[in-house]
């Protein structure tokens, strides 16, 4: 069983998947930083200090803090601002992946168009012989 597992792990597809997951996780951190450190401050500047991360609704009367971190210490909160930020992260990541897949597909199509057509395979020997006999009979 250990040998079968080793064969499974060493197959190319599993290794490619593992590399993809690792790169995807790192890329997700880049997108999160892009949203938190670049896009959200721009929204904040345009809309007057907008920071979705601190948008919440206290689910008990004991919650009266001004920041989400303090509010979570006071009790249960509905942190819809964090959800909005997560949705923005997802949309940006999905759009970037869409652009990457589109570029790869365009490259594949271009390479297929540029590839010369393969020469036709020679006919089987029996078909060639029958064609030759037909041609000889046609000459008589």
UniProtKB/Swiss-Prot annotation:
One of its GO terms (molecular function) is mechanosensitive monoatomic ion channel activity. PROSITE patterns: MSCL. The chain crosses the membrane at residues 8-28, 30-50, 81-101. InterPro entries: Mechanosensitive_channel_CS, MS_channel, MSC/AndL, MscL_channel. Its main location: membrane. Belongs to the MscL family. Homopentamer. This is Large-conductance mechanosensitive channel 3. It comes from Mesorhizobium japonicum (strain LMG 29417 / CECT 9101 / MAFF 303099) (Mesorhizobium loti (strain MAFF 303099)).
């Amino acid at each position: 069983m250990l040998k079968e597992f080793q064969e499974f792990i060493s197959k190319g597809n599993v290794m490619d998947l593992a590399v993809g997951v690792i790169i995807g996780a790192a890329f997700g951190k880049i997108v999160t930083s892009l949203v938190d450190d670049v896009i959200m401050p721009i929204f904040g500047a345009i809309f007057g200090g907008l920071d979705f991360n601190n948008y919440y609704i206290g689910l008990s009367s004991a919650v009266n803090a001004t920041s989400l971190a303090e509010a979570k210490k006071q009790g249960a909160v509905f942190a819809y601002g964090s959800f909005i930020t997560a949705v923005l992260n997802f949309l940006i990541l999905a759009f970037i992946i869409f652009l990457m897949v589109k570029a790869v597909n365009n490259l594949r199509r271009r390479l297929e168009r540029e590839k010369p057509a393969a020469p036709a395979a020679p006919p089987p020997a029996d078909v060639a012989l029958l064609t030759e006999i037909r041609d000889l009979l046609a000459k008589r």
